[in-house]
Amino acid sequence: MINWIKKKLTGILVRYLTAKVRNYEPFAVSEPEILETVLQIADVILVEGNQRFSAAVKYLTRSTWSHAAIYVGRASNLGNLPDGTPAVIEADLENGVIAVPLSKYEGFNTRICRPAGLNKSERREVVQFMVDSLGMNYDLKNVIDLARYLIPTPPVPNRWRRSMLALGSGDPTRVICSTRIAQAFQSVAYPILPRIERLTEKKCEQCHETVREILHIRHHSLFTPRDFDVSPYFEIIKPTIQRGFDHRQLTWNETAVRS
């Protein structure tokens, strides 16, 4: 009985959190066809969502980006997608880890984050990790945590905001959008935002001191969409620039330009 009530309440919360908010402003929108021309497999696509859930994530992370997905190329025997469909894999609040068409994010503000230096084999490993994750459940224990902070001025100190997104079940079969992507990159020893320890060494009395950096992997549950944006190891790809932007070809409103 208790489990039934809990499931019912969670369902109500999910429907509430996935409701769309008003006044969504598209300012960094690229057509799916244009995105596909610049995307490479294992690129991370950050999205500014238009749901209440998105507002909570953006508040807690103090970021524009509320969702992350990973580009896996054209579908081939990938879930229910027709073969040849440009596809991304994401963790969805209602459906868990799923493959969806790239066109799902048409009209949304997006950003492409590209892992620098990954070779083709490593990119394929990252993608395969995500493919193997299909069907995993979304960690709905985070739903209650996020719902609490949808009041206008949530009383959450800055130092606690990240931990609010790591209060989930701890069940490895349950994920949120950015955690599984973080694990995919960690599986090929690729850094996102590692903790850096600096060790000072001196090999002899007359030798100069040297500083060596040791990277420590952060737990995947602590990663948020924002981390791929601020990571020094991911390149920001702008489709407009990649496709040969020339400001001289723009048509301006003459009155606005002169004023």
Descriptions of predicted regions:
Residues 1-259:
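Cysteine-nucleophile amide-bond enzymes
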